[in-house]
Every structure is written in C-alpha cells, then in structure tokens.
C-alpha cells in the first residue's frame, strides 16, 4: 500500500495527518575561524571548547582546513557555531584566504611564550582587512596562559595591541579551559545581536561585555 509521504496511517478511512516537520536544533548559524601562527594552540583551543578535553603529547599541525560544530545558548537563543580551524603555515595561507569571505567572526590567537607569534599578529590583521568582510567580528586571544613561567609577552602588550585595532582581548588556556568558553559565548552573543535585536533591547558591545566578564572573574578569584 502506498501513502502520502510524511503522512501518518489511520484506521476507519480517516484522512491521514501529516507528521510535523522536524524543527532545527538551533535558531541561527555563525561561521567562526581560528587564525594565528602554527603552534599557537588553535586545534587544542577548539577541542577544549567542543569536547572539554585537552590534547597533550605530540603536536600535530592542522593541514589545510578542519571544522567542528557546537550549539550554544545565549539569552534563550540557540546559536550554532561552525568553527573552522585553519593551518598557520605559509603554504596553506592561500587556502585560508578563500574561507575569510564567509566568516562572521575571527578568533586571532598568539602564544604568550612565543614572541614571533605575537609579532606576526599585525600581518594577520592586514590579511583579515584585505580578505574578510568589513564588519567581521575580531577577537585577539593570548593563548597558553597556563605557562606563566615561560611567558615572554605581557598581558599589557596584548591589551595595548587590541586597543590599537579596536578589538576585544582575552588571555586563554586551551589546557585549563581558562576563558575558552567566554571567547565563544561573547562571539555568539554578538552574532545573535546582529541577527536582529529588538527595539527595546539594550545595545550590545562585545568589547564592553568581555571587559565586564574579565572584571567579574577577577573579583571572584579574590573572594
């Protein structure tokens, strides 16, 4: 016996009822790219956020492009973050450029124990301004903050550079999870606000939000 696709079979000649379509498990989608020199911890950063785990041991560089999805809820809105992990090596840079145009947000990482990765941030920002959307969300992240004994880049240096380019700044640790979730939640809140805020909804500034959360975290650490 054949029937209408998507219909529910009934008895006694009753008209079949269509099954309700499956509702998506998210309300909006945002494409986020992780950028920065090879070895700054982009892959570990992504896995810490996605799975709450840290990849220790042998370092394996990302080849080309990889991505993972995760849905986060901000202010009652489910935001699906499609997070692209990019290779930092120069030979893959042309591949990375092709993905800039569709990105709504970019997380730019450097390693606080590696001066060259910090010095190269300006070059990365030049590429971003050349290839990415004009209104793309950018956040600067000083990763490997758990390795304080090997630090060569002061937190103040990261703050100063971020202010120069008008972007929010966080120090993070893919190993301990420090500020990893905050970085993605801040991005999700910004994307949600841009997608269509209500007239009576207060304006959202991602830099102000990040700063307020940093101060809140600092206060809690002394309690």
Swiss-Prot record:
MF-aspect GO terms: G protein activity; GTP binding; GTPase activity
Pfam families: Ras
Lipid moiety-binding region (S-geranylgeranyl cysteine): 219-220
Propeptide span(s): 221-223
Consequence of substituting residue 89 to L: Decreased interaction with RPGR. Loss of exchange between RAB37-GDP to RAB37-GTP
N-acetylthreonine: residues carrying this PTM: 2
Modification type Cysteine methyl ester: residues: 220
Region (Disordered): 1-23
Localization of this protein: Cytoplasmic vesicle; Cell projection, Cilium
Activity regulation details: Regulated by guanine nucleotide exchange factors (GEFs) including RPGR which promote the exchange of bound GDP for free GTP. Regulated by GTPase activating proteins (GAPs) which increase the GTP hydrolysis activity. Inhibited by GDP dissociation inhibitors (GDIs).
Keyword list, A-Z: Acetylation, Cell projection, Cytoplasmic vesicle, GTP-binding, Hydrolase, Lipoprotein, Magnesium, Metal-binding, Methylation, Nucleotide-binding, Prenylation, Protein transport, Transport
Needed co-factor(s): Mg(2+)
Protein name (record): Ras-related protein Rab-37
Protein's organism: Homo sapiens
